[in-house]
Amino acid sequence: MAQRSPQELFHEAAQQGVLARSQPWWKIQLFMWEPVLFGTWDGVFTSCMINIFGVVLFLRTGWLVGNTGVLLGLLLVSFVILVALITVLSGIGVAEHGWMGSGGVYSMISSVLGGQMGGTVGLLYVFGQCVAGAMYLTGFAESISDLLGLGNIWAVRGISVAVLLALLGINLAGVKWIIRLQLLLLSLLAVSTLDFVVGSFTHLDPEHGFIGYSPELLQSNILPEYSPGESFFTVFGVFFPAATGVMAGFNMGGDLREPADQHTPRLPSSCWVSRGFSNIIFAFLLGAVCTREALRSDFLIAEKVSLVGFLFLLGLYISSLASCMGGLYGAPRILQCIAQDKVIPALAFLGNGKGPNKTPVAAICLTSLVTMAFVLVGQVNVLAPVVTINFMLTYIAVDYSYFALSMAHCGLAQSPEPMPRQGPDALHCSEHLLQDKAPSYGSDTPAGSLSEGTLLEFTKDMDQLLQPIGGLESQPRSREVNQVLKSQKHKCKKDAKQTLQDSFLLDAESPLSFSMGASERLSVASCGEQESYQNQQTSRSESHDHLVPDLCTQPRANGEDFFLKCRLQEQQVQRRPSAFYVCMCNPWVSLLGALASLLIMFVIQWLYTLASMGVAALVYLYIGQASPGLYLGSASNFSFFQWMKSFLVPSCRSLRSTREQIILAPSPAKVDMAMTQAYPGQWQTSATRERYHRSSFLSREQLMPPY
């Protein structure tokens, strides 16, 4: 039997020989008794495509065109696609820095902005997923009730609750064949979409408002004509939940066989481009073949346009159930990851999992209860704005995460303007530690020796302990050692001495000439390190230009390179090999997308936006008090307000802040100084005393002579 590729959909079953031989029906395992991991295409691609074909596309596209018109409707659909695409590209940019965790959006934001912000946004995202699941179930129940002729609102709620309980049982049991039906479900969605396109020019139904293509009809539907109480932004708030499935692929990072696969990050963007193309086709065709009255009043007008209405309804049912199933799958696992990280101690019981895949049973039950509470609302147009605000807050956090990570990664967060240099021989900010000589109190210090208690004295002691390269006696010997160090700098690791020099910010390129061999050994031993560091800085700057070309092309002072190296080591940001789609990730575009989303939130539902932001602020403060020791994030050294101040204040001369400067006493560059005793030969015992002043306490009895 040939060896199968691990990317195949039935790879796990083929290894067990299930496909090779038939088994009796009573021996077939329907439930997952072992961990099941997804591949790149059968996991990420199919999940993204099924989740983004939601109920809003099938039930509210005609209503959107009937209110906004064809022209403004296409503009609204394009704007929704653009906002979601910017978020997808921002998520790809964060994932390319090494993130791919099991917590989905929570892990992504926590790795950049810290656990406190990640926990806050993660809880908002979980709440939005629960409300979105209720909206999908309500849309499914509306279609079933219309098909059965049931106009009662309680019929819609009863159908929604029954379907929710069925999906809850499937999610808890983990039926294996449900996972393997994803490609089949995706094929049925494609067939239903094709059925709608073919039906738009193969038949007519004037009784229900489907009169076919005509220039007069398209011209009458080109301009907006809103229903009473509707506007552009209310329609936008109802239609935006069509973009809520873009993060489904990122939420599956912990259930992939190969999370670091190079194809994984680009699949969500490919899926969303396909979804955007489908939205535009739906909006244009409905506006070109149906009357405005039918578009605004009949939510199932697309079913009348389809050639075979049953196929369209099948696609609607599949998309509704799959989207709800995706919410019941992703939200509990994010909640489980938050509980496992102990972000909120009160939710620690939700971190336990059962079964081989660590199924979060408690989290699934909790999210199902929240979903059931919103199912009782029973109206899609009421639930859609709630979903919109929560998801837009999440998308703002993702966009800002990539912007902050890019700014912190390029070292522009703390130093937007380089300090002017006084000359080509200006000292580095770490050189004064090497050149200042502390006095030795009373010790017998010969001329030309190193001063006691300095970092160079510590380095000399480490030379004696670690026994590095021996003393250099002549200039030819120094050149020979330099050549040896240059040849071996890429073959061996740093020794302990060089590691200590890095940690104490020692700089070997000092203009002072020390007479002892220890200083010569210091300069020679750190020569190889300085050259390797310069090479690393060159390669790192090239990779930075590759990563964010707009940010890294700004000039930077040479004295800042050393501290930039230290900051990058603290951030511990990983980079993968650059791919062709990385150039599409731009931090400035992400920032503009975040600001645009924030503005739209206030225009759609400003009251609910303020309430959501207030709740988020309270959760943020509570997490800070309950769990103060959370991870700060790789972009913790970036402050948005300091960054804004650095750009806005210099533009106004009257508001220009004075730069703080520290004046250091100049040290003689080419003069050797030594300390000698004022009276040689006397007080020899003072040379053996330790390097600090002593004090003692004398009582009254010791001071008064005895009588």
Curated annotation (Swiss-Prot):
Q: Does the keyword Membrane apply?
A: yes
Question: Transmembrane helix: is it a keyword of this entry?
Answer: yes
Please state the protein's primary subcellular location: membrane
* Database matches in InterPro entries: AA-permease/SLC12A_dom, SLC12A_fam
User: Which GO cellular component term is one of those annotated?
Assistant: membrane
Span-the-membrane segments of this chain are: 36-59, 71-92, 98-115, 122-141, 153-172, 184-204, 232-251, 272-295, 307-329, 361-380, 392-412, 579-600, 606-623
Annotated region (Disordered), positions in chain: 469-489
Q: Molecular function (GO) terms listed?
A: potassium:chloride symporter activity
Q: Which domain of life is it from?
A: Eukaryota
Give membrane topology per the record.
Answer: Multi-pass membrane protein
PANTHER family per record = SOLUTE CARRIER FAMILY 12 MEMBER 8 (PTHR11827:SF6), SOLUTE CARRIER FAMILY 12, CATION COTRANSPORTERS (PTHR11827)
Free-text function comment from the UniProt entry: Cation/chloride cotransporter that may play a role in the control of keratinocyte proliferation.
Concerning its family, UniProt says: Belongs to the SLC12A transporter family.
What is the name of this protein?
Solute carrier family 12 member 8
**Protein's organism:** Rattus norvegicus (Rat)
